[in-house]
């Protein structure tokens, strides 16, 4: 089988390396200099280090060639580039099913990736989302990783999951596309909050409180959109949130840490080297939550820090001074 992976960042490349152990893989990016570098070195030195590409992994700069003969497309482009990627897939006449690993909400529309897929591909085409607690640096080293593939069709979810599953990479399946998408988007925003807390030396108790109240926030938002409550206690909810709020490779947590240490957002993004989806997602989540009438105090404070000049200390004080209430969702 041939699997086409769109996006040659750390996670796209880690997936390409993992999947190419069992299938032919075409890894595409539009950055010509990056393509040449990967073709010459047979590694992604820019984003992932010197993990060597095998014979079944081809690097492509031409999207048409990358998609030619594909049995499955896996899009790992940032959320704000996802719609354009789908438009290009349609323009080239490729009818292979699409799975994406983007985690966020589209800027301006505040749409989740599955809503973008509905806009561009419709419901008749098979598509799904791959998400869960997964750092590229660990997967590529052969460390055990478990994720969930949720799709608009249960049979397709099982089939696509079987294509990606193997060895140290466990792929569970689901049909709760909404819940899985929300978990992936919200955990990035909440990880910024956890980073701020850690950067301010608020301690382990505070981090645990942010994570658990973050799960409540994530669940309220997801259920209001039509997701299943139990999804948020699984890999793509609690699992991904815990990892992203505590792990050393978390870009979103790093943003929070550096904000707490006095750096401006512009300084952080200039030197981060990778996309931190939570930065762009917070504003869109607040917008969508307002439309739904869902209370999201942690996300709102993160948005205030990122986009409205509120200090991390003031944001933390605002959360601590909230009225006492029941722990219920």
Curated annotation (Swiss-Prot):
Pathway(s) per entry: Membrane lipid metabolism; glycerophospholipid metabolism
Active site, per annotation: 187
GO CC annotations, alphabetized: cytosol
Catalyzed reaction equations: sn-glycerol 3-phosphate + NAD(+) = dihydroxyacetone phosphate + NADH + H(+); sn-glycerol 3-phosphate + NADP(+) = dihydroxyacetone phosphate + NADPH + H(+)
Keyword Hydrolase attributed: no
GO MF, one example: glycerol-3-phosphate dehydrogenase [NAD(P)+] activity
Annotated sn-glycerol 3-phosphate binding sites: 103, 132, 134, 187, 240, 250-252
Keywords: Cytoplasm, Lipid biosynthesis, Lipid metabolism, NAD, NADP, Nucleotide-binding, Oxidoreductase, Phospholipid biosynthesis, Phospholipid metabolism
Domain of life: Bacteria
GO BP of this protein: carbohydrate metabolic process; glycerol-3-phosphate biosynthetic process; glycerol-3-phosphate catabolic process; glycerophospholipid metabolic process; phospholipid biosynthetic process
Cell compartment(s), UniProt: Cytoplasm
Keyword Lipid metabolism part of the UniProt annotation: yes
InterPro entries per record: 6-PGluconate_DH-like_C_sf, 6PGD_dom2, G3P_DH_NAD-dep, G3P_DH_NAD-dep_C, G3P_DH_NAD-dep_N, NAD(P)-bd_dom_sf
The enzyme's E.C. designation: 1.1.1.94
Pfam families per record: NAD_Gly3P_dh_C (PF07479), NAD_Gly3P_dh_N (PF01210)
Major localization listed first in the record, in broad terms: cytoplasm
Positions annotated to bind NADPH: 11, 30, 103, 136, 251, 275, 277
Function, as annotated: Catalyzes the reduction of the glycolytic intermediate dihydroxyacetone phosphate (DHAP) to sn-glycerol 3-phosphate (G3P), the key precursor for phospholipid synthesis.
Family note: Belongs to the NAD-dependent glycerol-3-phosphate dehydrogenase family.
Protein name in UniProt: Glycerol-3-phosphate dehydrogenase [NAD(P)+]
Organism annotation: Methylobacillus flagellatus (strain ATCC 51484 / DSM 6875 / VKM B-1610 / KT)
Gene for this chain: gpsA
């Amino acid at each position: 089988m041939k699997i086409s992976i769109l996006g040659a960042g750390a996670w796209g490349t880690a997936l390409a390396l993992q999947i190419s152990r069992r299938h032919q893989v075409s890894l595409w990016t539009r950055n010509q200099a990056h393509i040449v570098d990967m073709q010459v070195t047979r590694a992604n030195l820019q984003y992932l280090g010197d993990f060597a590409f095998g014979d079944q992994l081809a690097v492509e700069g031409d999207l048409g060639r990358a998609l030619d003969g594909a049995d499955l497309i896996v899009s790992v482009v940032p959320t704000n580039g996802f719609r354009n990627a789908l438009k290009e897939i349609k323009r080239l006449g490729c009818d292979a099913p699409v799975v994406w690993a983007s985690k966020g909400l589209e800027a301006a529309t505040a749409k989740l990736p599955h809503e973008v897929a509905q806009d561009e591909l419709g419901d008749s085409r098979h598509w799904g989302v791959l998400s869960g607690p997964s750092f590229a640096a660990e997967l590529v080293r052969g460390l055990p990783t478990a994720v969930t593939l949720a799709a608009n069709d249960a049979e397709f979810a099982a089939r696509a999951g079987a294509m990606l599953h193997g060895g140290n990479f466990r792929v569970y399946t689901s049909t709760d596309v909404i819940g899985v998408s929300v978990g992936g988007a919200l955990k990035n925003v909440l990880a910024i909050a956890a980073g701020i807390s850690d950067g301010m030396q608020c301690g382990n108790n505070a981090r645990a409180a942010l994570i658990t109240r973050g799960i409540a926030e994530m669940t309220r938002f997801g259920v209001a959109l039509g997701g299943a409550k139990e999804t948020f206690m699984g890999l793509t909810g609690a699992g991904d949130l815990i990892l992203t709020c505590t792990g050393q490779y978390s870009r979103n947590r790093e943003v929070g840490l550096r904000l707490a240490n006095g750096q401006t957002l512009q300084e952080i993004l200039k030197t981060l080297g990778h996309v931190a989806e939570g930065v762009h997602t917070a504003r869109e989540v607040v917008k969508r939550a307002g439309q739904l009438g869902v209370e999201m105090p942690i996300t709102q404070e993160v948005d205030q820090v990122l986009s409205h000049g509120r200090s991390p200390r003031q944001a933390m004080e605002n959360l601590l001074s909230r009225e006492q209430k029941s722990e219920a969702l």
